[in-house]
A protein has these predicted regions:
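Histidine-centered catalytic micro-motifs
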Residues: 86-94, 157-159, 212-215
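Bacterial N-terminal signal peptides that target proteins for export
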Residues: 1-9
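His/Asp/Glu-enriched short active-site or ligand-binding loop at hydrolase and phosphoryl-transfer sites
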Residues: 158, 163-204, 241-252
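Active-site beta->alpha N-cap acidic-glycine motif
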Residues: 20-113, 117-121, 132-150
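N-terminal signal peptide c-region/cleavage motif recognized by signal peptidases
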Residues: 16-18
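Acidic-and-aromatic substrate-binding clefts and catalytic sites of carbohydrate-active enzymes
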Residues: 33-38, 58-72, 95-100, 151-161, ...
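Hydrophobic residues in well-ordered beta-strands that form the structural core
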Residues: 55, 87-89, 176, 213, ...
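C-terminal domain-boundary segment and adjacent tail
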Residues: 53, 63, 221-260
């Protein structure tokens, strides 16, 4: 079984650009880090379905181990790189933008939701914010041996034009998600059951959409993954969709290529 698993991973990794050349109705599945308990199961589904995704990573608290970018999870990240997935920053301390601050130079009120400063409201300049993006990217490169994409996702998708301009100036383009691409794994399961979320996604997703889910959500009682993930992938394939990473996304392709 181990040999077969490695062979499948190699086949996915080697598919490369030829796989995407035939992808004329693409969607772009992305995962943000979380408590990581379901991460191994998500990886199994992605490998079984030969789907490559883009992972946005922060060093978040985990149910097992020393944080989602800690040493405990290092083998998991290396395996995903070997399978041909892409990686990008989610800010090191999972930092939420709260407000722009007045002044000539860009400054922001932010709140870390992981690490030593968790919960604190902080006033940061552009350099401090960019360092947060870069720190997660540097750690990803150490873990995976692969250069991350010059992209990032702000936690919660919370941004301002000034914040986006500051990140762009230090080399990072922001990636959000399509309205239909919000897969709902953060929503309470007593009101938004897995079958309901699956049906909504299969009904609403359109070609070109960026989709977002997480590697574990602390607050959801009925985990979204892997229960919804495989039926979603199968259902989208049956509707003629194919899957690509953000390296191939038309809005980011030139930006990624220019970064080398």
């Amino acid at each position: 079984m181990r040999h077969a698993s490695k062979s499948a991973a190699l086949a996915i990794a080697l598919a490369g650009p030829m796989a995407w050349a035939a992808c004329d109705k693409p969607v772009y599945l992305t995962f943000d880090t979380g408590h990581m308990e379901v991460a191994p199961l998500i990886a199994e589904v992605l490998q079984r379905q030969a789907v490559r995704v883009t992972f946005f990573a922060a060093n978040e608290r985990t149910k097992v181990g020393d944080g989602s970018l800690g040493e405990h999870w290092a083998p998991w990240w290396r395996e995903r790189a070997a399978e041909g997935h892409e990686f990008a920053s989610h800010t090191w301390s999972h930092v939420y933008w709260r407000a722009d601050l007045p002044g000539a130079a860009p400054r922001f009120k932010v709140q870390a939701s992981a690490g030593a400063q968790q919960g604190l409201l902080l006033n940061w300049g552009a350099a401090e914010y960019c360092q947060q993006i870069q720190q997660a990217g540097d750690r990803l490169q150490t873990l995976t041996g692969k250069k991350p994409l010059p992209l990032y996702r702000a936690p919660g998708g919370k941004t301002s034009p000034q914040l986006l301009a500051a990140a762009k100036a230090c080399g990072y383009a922001h990636v959000g998600w399509a309205a239909a691409g919000f897969l709902g794994d953060e929503l309470p399961s007593d009101k938004f059951s897995n079958p309901l979320l699956l049906a909504k996604a299969l009904r609403d997703i359109r070609s070109g959409d960026i989709l977002v889910a997480h590697l574990g959500i602390w607050s959801r009682q009925e985990p979204w993954a892997p229960a919804v993930l495989e039926p979603l992938l199968l259902g989208l394939k049956a509707r003629g969709f194919c899957f690509a990473t953000l390296r191939e996304h038309p809005a980011y392709r030139a930006w990624v290529a220019a970064s080398g």
